[in-house]
């Protein structure tokens, strides 16, 4: 006869090996923070390209928090809380390299964090 503690230990072992997943709305702040983290990293890696884009599109503005995060190499995630989801989407999808570079990186980062999104 199998002991209840053996069953519980087996269930706990299975649960520990399964990766946790969370399904969130695309506008959820946790999703936005992952997106903004990828965005800030991409700006740091391709700063000249972003400067050129900004020069060609002077009406495309960024919240000051994004600029501060780009040049602050410490933990910047707390700086980025509170940026409206529609503003996050506008910034990220507004650059020509969104589909080729940002979208795959964001998908990868969300997946790595066990986050899956659903439409709002």
From Swiss-Prot:
Q: Kindly name one Pfam family recorded for this protein.
A: SRP1_TIP1
Keywords per UniProt: Membrane, Transmembrane, Transmembrane helix
The molecular function terms of the Gene Ontology recorded here are: structural constituent of cell wall
The gene that this protein is the product of is PAU2
Q: Name one GO cellular component term.
A: fungal-type cell wall
**Protein name according to UniProt:** Seripauperin-2
**PROSITE patterns (alphabetical):** SRP1_TIP1
- GO annotation, biological process: fungal-type cell wall organization
The record's subcellular locations are: Membrane
Q: Which family does it belong to?
A: Belongs to the SRP1/TIP1 family. Seripauperin subfamily.
Major subcellular location class? membrane
Organism of origin is: Saccharomyces cerevisiae (strain ATCC 204508 / S288c) (Baker's yeast)
Give the residue spans that cross the bilayer: 7-24
């Amino acid at each position: 006869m199998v002991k209840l503690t053996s069953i519980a230990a087996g269930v706990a072992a299975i649960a520990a090996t399964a990766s946790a997943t969370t399904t969130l709305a695309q506008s959820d702040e946790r999703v936005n923070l992952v997106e903004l983290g990828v965005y800030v990293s991409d700006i740091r890696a391709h700063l000249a390209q972003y400067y050129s884009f900004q020069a060609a599109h002077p009406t495309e503005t960024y919240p000051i928090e994004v600029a501060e995060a780009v040049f602050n190499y410490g933990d910047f995630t707390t700086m980025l809380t509170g940026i409206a989801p529609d503003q996050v989407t506008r910034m990220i999808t507004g650059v020509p390299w969104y589909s080729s570079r940002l979208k795959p990186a964001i998908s990868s980062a969300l997946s790595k964090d066990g986050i899956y999104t659903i439409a709002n």
